[in-house]
Amino acid sequence: ASLNENMYTFLIVGLDKVAYHTDTIMVGRFDVETHEINVVSIPRDTLMNITGSTKKINELFLRGMNNTDGDQDAKLQGGIDRMLEGITDILGFTPDVYAAVDLEAFVQLVDAIGGVDYDVPVDMHYSDPTQDLYINLDAGMQHLTGEQALAVMRFRSGYASADIGRIGTQQDFLMSIASQFLTLGSIPHLTEFIDIFTEYVETNMTTENLAFFARQFLLCKSEDIHFY
């Protein structure tokens, strides 16, 4: 349940449906009265106090899937449930809402809004055929497609601080998207956005919930959105 009627906590994970690792993990709080959003990134290599060989938080999702019987939907829910347990162990509370965002969904969501303008901080060149991952972006301001935006979110080999460097870029990139939405004062193609979300994203939010949070988000100011 929500801490109070105006405040909601949330968990967002980026889900790699090849290895089922969650290399992007963000927990936040949205106050719909003050319209302030605070988001904390949890590093993928955070160690957990759990039994077995799995120790990193980004492997919890797969562990939950493997320990769940049933069809793929049941296994995905098992992964989410195990992830929520791990987050609760770390933070002491269970987020009100969650969203496990498939990588393809992220591509489609960015394309649905017509791409995004972003100042890529470093040259990003990386290839890994085993993951079907090919990144080829030069540093500088540019208009990114969904595939290019995903490359920015996934790239980490070029940072001196590896995943911590990637987290900083992820936060900066998401802030850039948020600022562009708020400058427009609307979310282009909101219906399409929600359709993609409901089809590709594992979440406990209803369509009505998504529309509510979208409306509330548009009442925020950029300076009231904080990443840590």
Q: Where do the language-model regions lie?
A:
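Non-catalytic, solvent-exposed segments at the cell envelope interface
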Residues: 1-228
